[in-house]
């Protein structure tokens, strides 16, 4: 597996987590029902490296079993720009978000947002990813 688990102990990771929470607050402002849910947390941050032609191409969603039922949302932060391929694609929304350095995407973890990572075609893809959980 081309991933690494990171903790929020270093300054750069803490800075990123603070920015992620700021984005989450903006997300919640659009879906006010989440105000009543309570505390959210980020259990882990994964750093993924995807080589050309690789990726997680299978359609999936993030809360697909009881162990993952506490996942409210998934997120991904693109660490580099991929010129061809490497998009995150959502099945039912019919959209593809390209891998552009610095972009952060947050989406519901439920089956309504079934998605996949398309393979990068023109170089490696680097991504921080994880979940907002109850």
Predicted regions and their residues:
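Fe(II)/2-oxoglutarate oxygenase catalytic core
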Residues: 1-104, 112-134
